[in-house]
Amino acid sequence: MSVGSLSSGARRSRQERTGNLLTTAQAATVARLALANVEREFPNKLDHVMAGTTDVAPPRALHPAFFGSFDWHSCVHAHWLLARILRLQADVVEAALIRGTLESHLSAANVAAEVEYFRRPESRTFERSYGWAWLLKLAAELGQWSDVDAQRWSRNLAPLAQAVAGAYLDWLPDATYPIRHGVHSNTAFALAFAHDYAGSCAATALGELVVAKAREWYLGDIDAPARWEPSGADFFSPTLIEADLMRRILDPSEFPDWLARFLPGIERREPRTLFSPAVVSNRSDPYIVHLDGLNLSRAWCWRAIAGALPRDDRRATIATAAADAHRAAGMIGVASGEYVGDHWLATFAVLALTT
């Protein structure tokens, strides 16, 4: 799937002002991918601790809302993708199918079953923290939307979102150290999406804890070792995902100075590894294809960083160029025909295009 060209300069200007670079054709493509994925039960990689033989069950029985898309977190964020496209581009051809899918999957009964599963003693660390973050992101997306259907889905999802928010409140005080890997367990990513949820859904206690933990873990970081990136299975840049968190946490007047200490080489485009898209040698390999996701997540991080800097800050222009280069590279891998990437990369593409 290529980035494609926008229909006119005027349209591009409007989209850039609103933060939405997603074209109608791209919206249709990723919507079709997500619609197919959320209904595809197999293959499936369960994160399922069994206390006995009675816990043996297929994905649809365990997770009636989020049984598809290969794994639970990918299914959750595919629903976020569908909700976001419907909110931003209500006239997308697949709109009726999207509404029907969200109505069916996000029923009160389905969500109640997900809550019951989440509260099992054996599920204490189920999908911590990547799946938790995406569930809160879905809740935040629905919660900010005035659409009548979306308001109903938001109410239905609220018990699960509240359970996840409660799990954050239980976990974070015990978490002495951050997790800085460029994969699912990254705590900067977990805090970023929890912060978004707390702000849009009035979860004051969670928001305060997230801010406190982000400052404890990341405020003093200097001269990030980004020259060591990427690792071979990264789909996040540990460096940029941290900066994407801190631009949320810090006052707008604080962030530019923090960024100068954290990444002092931006104006020199150093380290080069952070400005050069990753090479993806084999899109049929489930770990190597993570690097397509890395390019897309770097794109949304660089774009968000640029937006958090003053307009006359030279680093904003450099960050925007880096975002454009990574987005172009990452979009090549979306809809490749390889399910190891197709079950999740569309979501990263939508974030890169609409952040």
List the model feature ranges, each with a label:
Residues G19-T24, R60-V76, E116-W132, D174-T187, ...:
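Solvent-exposed loop and edge beta-strand segments that line ligand/cofactor-binding
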Residues V76, I85-A198:
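Extended ligand-binding groove/face enriched in aromatic
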Residues C201-E338:
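Long, repeat-rich segments with strong aromatic
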